[in-house]
Amino acid sequence: MKYMTVTDLNNAGATVIGTIKGGEWFLGTPHKDILSKPGFYFLVSKLDGRPFSNPCVSARFYVGNQRSKQGFSAVLSHIRQRRSQLARTIANNNVPYTVFYLPASKMKPLTTGFGKGQLALAFTRNHHSEYQTLEEMNRMLADNFKFVLQAY
């Protein structure tokens, strides 16, 4: 099993939405409409811009549809409150993390289509079942990749 990298995220179509440090936005806060989108949010440390740099993904979080529309802001609140070992690590290590967003509709290359060529990927099923959950996709990510700060 390999570590997920920025290249994997870029190939799937992820977008950078900002940078956090200690559970707070660093260098500007994205608009609430961006932060409330359901999907997956990936944290990457040391995104330094070197041409051959391909840092590993430190952690992943998913956000479903919420009536409150808190989205990723709720994740940041959990980090600031240090509600888990992962949250305590991110809150206390003084490391800036670049936040990538990927909607569930673009998860196929990282889940059911992982490790397949372009032709095979075209014939791999999409995630569109009414019973397909973000939790299930999260487990598929854990089956296919390792993350620096997460064991599962």
From Swiss-Prot:
Share an example GO biological-process annotation for this protein. Answer: symbiont-mediated suppression of host DNA replication
InterPro entries of this UniProt entry? Phage_Ndd (IPR009514)
Provide the alphabetized UniProt keywords.
DNA-binding, Host-virus interaction, Inhibition of host DNA replication by virus, Modulation of host cell cycle by virus
The stretch of residues making up the signal peptide is none
Record's Pfam families?
A: Phage_T4_Ndd
Molecular function GO terms recorded: DNA binding
Q: What does the record give as the function of this protein? A: Disorganizes the host nucleoid and inhibits replication, but without host DNA cleavage or degradation. Only the architecture of the nucleoid is affected. May act on the host chromosomal sequences that determine the structure of the nucleoid. Binds to dsDNA but not to ssDNA.
Q: What is this protein called?
A: Nucleoid disruption protein
- Species: Enterobacteria phage T2 (Bacteriophage T2)
Q: What is the lineage of its organism?
A: Viruses, Duplodnaviria, Heunggongvirae, Uroviricota, Caudoviricetes
Q: Which gene encodes it?
A: ndd
